[in-house]
C-alpha cells in the first residue's frame, strides 16, 4: 500500500528534548508509524533555560542559540530516520514547531517567537521543512495558540459525549470536543513548568519523577489559595499563556515568605495547584452525561496529578491517549506532522473558534529542501 509520510518535530517548554514522529496520511485517520526522542544537550538546555527565565539576552546569543537548535533538529531527524530505516525521500515534508522563547498575544504589538534555524533543517536533511506556524494565525487576529485542537478533533471527536483532550507539558491546554458544536481549545493553567523549576532549584533535578518528592510534602492551604487567585483564570477563552507568566518569580510574588515553607510542601502544593486549576475549568464544561478526559504530555505520567483528576472529577472518565491509540508523549509531534500535511496541500489548519482568529488560514512557512 502506498504510504504518505510526514515527520513531526516538537520541543516544548519543558526543555527536556526533541520529540519526533512519523504519521502516515494514506490511512484514515492518519496512523502514527514511528516515534522517537532526542535529549536536549545540557549546554543548550542551560542556555535556553537562562534565556527563558532571565528574559534578557544579546542578539549574538539569540542568533547562536537559533543556529544550535537548527543543528539539533537536523541531526535528531537524520538519526531518527536511520534508526527506523527511512530515507529522506520517504518523507514528504517535516513539520517543526521550533522552540518558543516568547509568546505575547495581548500587547499593543502582539508577537510570538519560535527559534531554531529551519534553513539548516531543510539543508541538512534534504527534506522540505515547514515551520513558523503561529504567526499567520496572529496576523489574522488570533492568539497563535493552541494549534493542536484541530488535530485532536480529527482523531478523538465523538458524537456520543463531550471529550476533552488535556495536554500537560510546561503549560496545560485543552481541546474541547463537543458533539454538534465547534471545537474550542485554549491554555487553562500551568502544567509541569512550576514543579520542574522548583525541583530543579532545590534538588538540581529536571522533574519530579512519579511525583515522588511531592508525595513527601503536605499541602499549604494559604499558598494554594493565593496561587488560585490569579487573574488569568478569570479571562474568557480563547486565551493562552506561558512561562512568561507562570515562573518562579510569579511564585515568589504569590507568597509573603516562600522560604518559610519546607520545599517539599511547596512542591505538593504546586501539584495540587496544577490539578485544581485545570479541574476548575473542566467543571465549567461538564454535562449531565459522563464526559471523557484524555490526558497526554509529560503530566500524564504524574500519578499524583492523574489521581487528583479522578478524585476531583466524579462525572468524568479519566484516561490517557495511550488507551486510545496515540502515545501520550507524541501527540504534539503528531499534530505538527498534520500541520505540515495541511500546509503542503494548502488546507486551513487553524480553528477561529479556538484561537480567536478572524478567518481560517493555512499555517506555516515552507523552507524548500
Curated annotation (Swiss-Prot):
Belongs to the anhydro-N-acetylmuramic acid kinase family. Coiled coil: none annotated. This is Anhydro-N-acetylmuramic acid kinase. One of its GO terms (biological process) is peptidoglycan turnover. Keywords: ATP-binding, Carbohydrate metabolism, Kinase, Nucleotide-binding, Transferase. SUPFAM superfamilies: Actin-like ATPase domain (SSF53067). Pfam families: AnmK (PF03702). Pathway: Amino-sugar metabolism; 1,6-anhydro-N-acetylmuramate degradation; Cell wall biogenesis; peptidoglycan recycling. It catalyses: 1,6-anhydro-N-acetyl-beta-muramate + ATP + H2O = N-acetyl-D-muramate 6-phosphate + ADP + H(+). It is an enzyme of class 2 (transferase). It comes from the Bacteria. InterPro entries: Anhydro_N_Ac-Mur_kinase, ATPase_NBD. Catalyzes the specific phosphorylation of 1,6-anhydro-N-acetylmuramic acid (anhMurNAc) with the simultaneous cleavage of the 1,6-anhydro ring, generating MurNAc-6-P. Is required for the utilization of anhMurNAc either imported from the medium or derived from its own cell wall murein, and thus plays a role in cell wall recycling. Gene3D superfamilies: 3.30.420.40. ATP binds at residues 12-19. Its EC number is 2.7.1.170. One of its GO terms (molecular function) is kinase activity.
